[in-house]
Amino acid sequence: MDSKYQCVKLNDGHFMPVLGFGTYAPAEVPKSKALEATKLAIEAGFRHIDSAHLYNNEEQVGLAIRSKIADGSVKREDIFYTSKLWCNSHRPELVRPALERSLKNLQLDYVDLYLIHFPVSVKPGEEVIPKDENGKILFDTVDLCATWEAVEKCKDAGLAKSIGVSNFNRRQLEMILNKPGLKYKPVCNQVECHPYFNQRKLLDFCKSKDIVLVAYSALGSHREEPWVDPNSPVLLEDPVLCALAKKHKRTPALIALRYQLQRGVVVLAKSYNEQRIRQNVQVFEFQLTSEEMKAIDGLNRNVRYLTLDIFAGPPNYPFSDEY
């Protein structure tokens, strides 16, 4: 297999490419950009494409995948596509219809991976963040173990090859793993992870349970207000990363991506810029020494860019625990 498509074996026997293309973009970015960027990513060598119902771009991303299949660039089985169940569909009876809606938007028969996007539940309906007349979020109370059972049924039905979670803390992972009658373990936990927030404890826990950690915001470049504090430090301007980039004749982004691969983390690189999309697949062309890895480990300062504190309050809010 070409180094560009290096994969990790998941606990269910399926394989996931270790470098993924993240398709999220702020609301003001035209959706047509998701179509163009996803096509460029596949042309550049990305085979793992990450999206979600929340991103409101699955129609465009699906079209990009299907157009690259139609022109002979790739086969469907070459592409590893991830979608995610949003918080307004946690009730067990809403899980399969939510996935079927994503598949209809994508015009695909199955997804390779379906994740519970975030562990806090909100009231069902069309609104992704439903609020009352005072602007308060309308939360829902759902047993995530029941949600997980409904996700397992999607795997049994062949609608998702693999299933996992995102933004879960250790306690929430243990709740699923210790569930009586568990049929399938989550294959992965997709979380924010980068040199300023390296998730060492959660990574060690996931490895001990044969769960892959997938890193989003791996470049810390998602600085969209009001989600991210504009005063938070800019990761890609870090002097250590910049010095290593200079030494290896690479970009600071590539250093941050390579760091994750060498510690056994699957990494998502999100960019709509053609040059950077092409650059990011160079992550397989060089290696960091153990000293360089240690230096990057030393940058950790527990800076979580995406606190999602609008969801704080309910007991399932994941980021109050240490990890």
Swiss-Prot record:
Q: What is the effect of changing residue 307 to V?
A: No effect on progesterone reduction
Pathway assignment: Steroid metabolism
Site positions (May be involved in the mediating step between the transformation of progesterone and the release of the cofactor): 222
Q: What is its EC number?
A: 1.1.1.-, 1.1.1.112, 1.1.1.209, 1.1.1.210
Tell me the impact of changing residue 222 to S. Answer: Marked decrease in k(cat)/K(m) value for progesterone; 10-fold decrease for progesterone reduction; 3-fold decrease for 20alpha-OHProg oxidation. 10-fold decrease in K(m) value for NADPH
Superkingdom of the organism of origin: Eukaryota
Primary site of residence = cytoplasm
What's the name of the protein? Aldo-keto reductase family 1 member C1
Please give the organism: Homo sapiens (Human)
Q: Which gene encodes it?
A: AKR1C1
